[in-house]
Design a protein with these regions (language model features):
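PLP-dependent amino-acid enzyme catalytic core
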Residues: 1-181
Length: 181
């Protein structure tokens, strides 16, 4: 997936970078910046990444544009990621993988069960994610690396929260975006 869209601030700052970084547009950027009036602070602003996309907003959309772009560039048809049983990153990954026709597998570790965790568990299923409960965080990380090496080397692996090189590019772009705003 070659990205010739030069409208993102990072690509304006670094011409030619867009041709080397795979990206699939998933969100509407830039997101607005709003001054918080309700707190007792003179100058506190918030970047509204919750408005980044209609399907599922939030900062993970920024990361997934580049992560899933790389998965597509590599010809991967399955994405595997990890998180707690209520992971918002996992939910965003499931939603956008389904939208792009990519299978999604979530390796999940325990966390307290709250109403939002229950909601996310239902939504993973709704969006077609395969969920594997692996128990503790150490067991999940072990399963992540063993699955990759031994059982499913053809999948695209994304560490917790979309924390990889490609995901970071989305946040770097947000910094350039914020500077312009």
């Amino acid at each position: 997936v070659n990205n010739t869209d030069q409208t993102l601030p990072i690509f304006r700052e670094y011409p030619g970078l867009g041709e080397r970084l795979p990206r699939i547009p998933l969100g509407a950027f830039p997101t607005p910046v709003r001054k918080l009036e309700c707190l007792d602070c003179d100058n506190l602003w918030v970047k509204r990444d919750d408005l980044s996309a209609a399907a599922y907003g939030g900062n993970k959309v920024r990361k997934l544009e580049f992560i899933l772009g790389e998965a597509k560039r590599l010809g991967k048809r399955d994405v595997v990621t990890i998180g707690g049983i209520g992971t918002n990153h996992g939910l965003a990954t499931a939603i956008y993988c389904k939208k792009l026709g990519i299978k999604c597998t979530l390796l999940l570790f325990e966390q307290p069960v709250t109403s939002y965790v229950k909601r996310n568990l239902l939504l993973y299923r709704y969006f077609g994610a395969r969920t594997i409960f692996t128990g503790s965080l150490p067991k999940t990380v072990l399963a992540y690396f063993l699955t990759h090496r031994l059982f499913h080397p053809a999948a695209h692996y994304v560490f917790a929260g979309g924390s990889d090189v490609y995901g970071t590019v989305g946040f770097v772009n947000a910094a350039f975006e914020l500077r312009r705003q």
